């Protein structure tokens, strides 16, 4: 069995170890929840302070030009594009994932007007399904949502399907879809594909251009470390950008927003996927957070993440075997994202006990503890130490107290 000394040797050889110093990690905390909210980059603190003190505090309205506020959605989008395998000027930062999903799904359905079926799976994040349900009701034109098990997606893509809407990395199991196989099958039947990259961006090597994906959305507050509620992104393949129109439009997506025309004329390219004025302070924090990735290769990031995931599972199953802790998700780590879910009948209480011991993960219903591994700031020693605390919590039944059973508003 691997020892803590072995974990420290892995850390010493880690080619990403220098990145940890760029983050503000609370002393004594093992933070394994970057799949839910990333750690604060030190550069983001300085950038936001400058944005408040100087750009807003002194330069005020001139900052739209002087400090490039107006251009930020595309500037940051191009930084994200490199990580998700997208070409230049195909990604825009705006709004939330749910709003962006509404925009790209409405655009995709309008592009395929004779077809009425949206295919998704039971592993998709529920908000995407809610958006599809709401949009179908809003359109009120006979559209339906076909939700199948992840393994049945390929068979569900038939010639009546307008859009296939999937999350690449399952938010619970970390199972990854084969993006190329799904996209190829959809295109062969005449359907368009939307990929939700919420648990992929900054976690796994991107491949949007490689697989010829039509649309994608993703968030920036998880592995990209943009901050709580940081704006999301939308991707549209260049061949579609000037052909599609989202149902939700606004002045920032206008071809000439400062001419204030009473009639909407879409901007060229990806710019039309914007709607309203962007949140500047959040944009500045995200811009600084993305600069942390400038010297990082996603292949290296994913390789480290998979090693950490495998080590975590190996240690947890060995040291917590008598407590019936079970892996939820694939054992083939090449087919996973960068988080691990463990099942236990008292998962919520166990997670609260872990948090009280400064090991931070989260809980997902009905019985899953999630642990996310962010290679820019997590270490192999973090993995070893976290499992040791998990063993202690289970062996000593530290979870078995009333306050750890009481569900909080956010789990």
Residue spans for each PLM region:
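Pyridoxal 5′-phosphate
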Residues: 1-411
């Amino acid at each position: 069995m691997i020892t803590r000394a072995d974990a420290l040797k892995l850390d010493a050889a880690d080619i990403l170890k220098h990145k940890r110093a760029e983050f503000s990690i609370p002393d004594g905390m093992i933070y394994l929840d970057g799949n839910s909210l990333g750690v604060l980059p030190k550069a983001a603190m300085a950038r936001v302070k400058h944005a408040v003190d100087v750009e807003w505090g002194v330069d005020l309205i001139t900052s739209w030009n002087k400090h490039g506020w107006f251009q930020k959605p595309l500037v940051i989008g191009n930084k994200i594009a490199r990580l998700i395998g997208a070409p230049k000027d195909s990604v825009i930062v705006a709004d939330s994932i749910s709003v962006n999903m509404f925009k790209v799904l409405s655009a995709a359905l309008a592009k395929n007007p004779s077809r009425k079926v949206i295919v998704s799976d039971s592993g998709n994040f529920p908000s995407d399904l809610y958006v599809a349900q709401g949009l179908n009701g809003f359109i009120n034109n006979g559209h339906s949502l076909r939700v199948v098990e992840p393994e049945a997606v390929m068979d569900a893509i038939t010639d009546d399907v307008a859009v296939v809407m999937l999350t690449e990395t399952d938010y619970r199991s970390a199972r990854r879809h084969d993006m190329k196989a799904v996209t190829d099958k959809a295109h062969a039947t005449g359907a368009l594909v939307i990929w939700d990259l919420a648990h992929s961006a900054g976690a796994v090597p991107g491949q949007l251009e490689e697989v010829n994906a039509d649309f994608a959305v993703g968030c920036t507050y998880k592995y990209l470390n943009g901050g709580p509620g940081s704006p999301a992104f939308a991707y549209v393949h260049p061949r579609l950008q000037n052909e599609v129109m989202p149902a939700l439009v606004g002045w920032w997506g206008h071809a000439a927003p400062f001419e204030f025309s009473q009639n909407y004329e879409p901007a060229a390219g990806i710019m039309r996927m914007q709607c309203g004025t962007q949140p500047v302070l959040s944009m500045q924090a995200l811009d600084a957070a993305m600069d942390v990735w400038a010297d990082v290769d996603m292949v290296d990031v994913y390789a480290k993440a998979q090693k950490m995931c495998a080590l975590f599972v190996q240690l947890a199953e060995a040291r917590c075997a008598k407590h019936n802790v079970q892996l939820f998700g694939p054992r083939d780590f090449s087919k996973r994202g960068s988080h691990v879910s463990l099942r236990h009948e008292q998962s919520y209480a166990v997670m609260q006990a872990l948090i009280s011991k400064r090991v931070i993960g989260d809980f997902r219903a009905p019985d899953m503890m999630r642990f996310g591994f962010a290679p820019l700031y997590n270490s192999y020693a973090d993995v070893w130490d976290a499992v040791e605390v998990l063993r202690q919590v289970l062996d000593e039944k530290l979870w078995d107290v009333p306050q750890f059973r009481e569900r909080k508003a956010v789990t």
